[in-house]
Amino acid sequence: MHDVPYTVCPGPEVTAAMAVLSAAIRQSCPRVPLGVQVLCAANQQAIAIALAAGLDFIRAEGFVFSHVADEGIINACAGDLLRYRKHIGAENIQIFADIKKKHSAHALTADVSVAQTAAAAQLFLANGVVLTGTATGHPADPQQLREVKHAVKIPVLVGSGVTLENVKNYLDADALIIGSYFKKEGYWANAVDPDRVKKFMEHISKLRE
């Protein structure tokens, strides 16, 4: 997230750099589930990176329905993305699709609920959906989580705003994507704070008892 402003079609140097970094992380963490996302909406590039680096999943923007993002209009990509995944032999790479994505306006689909968006992503063969708040570090709506869980059978991930204080609101999620809270002072651009990570995971362990 350090190359703002993002472009809709990032250059090949971005894909190359991300592939090298992803491969290095995979080598360091051979048994941990790993994924990649490339902004902005560079989902085919992410699939290629994941295949080359031996990753397990990507996070995809604009999988179903169009929306207006900071970078402009992002159109649905499910058909092209799944065909590309098959074409390069990457069908083992799972696709977790953002729904009603953060940092975006959804007036174009104001008559489509978040649950309906999730159902469409499931119909279009997403392996899971990602529910977020309105921006990085902003919490998702727990009521929307319940609605989406009721609407689909695929995994539902919460992808923003999870903290030590509010994680109990998201225990029904199948997975959590945590960035900001794990950084120093809880700010997304800072370095990871091992103490915050340790404290959070200890709290999760207690909740699981």
Describe the residue ranges of each PLM region.
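Active-site beta-loop-alpha junctions enriched in small/polar residues
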Residues: 1, 37-43, 63-65, 98-104, ...
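Glycine-rich, proline-tolerant flexible connector loops at the mouths of alpha/beta enzymes
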Residues: 1-17, 65-70, 126-140, 185-187
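Conserved anion-binding
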Residues: 44-125
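Catalytic cores of alpha/beta
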Residues: 41-54, 117, 148-178
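Alpha-helix-loop-beta-strand connector modules within alpha/beta enzyme cores
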Residues: 6-36, 75-97, 140-163, 195-209
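Conserved beta-strand positions in the central sheet of alpha/beta enzyme cores
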Residues: 58-59, 130, 177
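Internal alpha/beta core interface subdomains
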Residues: 115-132, 138-155
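Long hydrophobic alpha-helical segments typical of transmembrane helices together
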Residues: 164-204
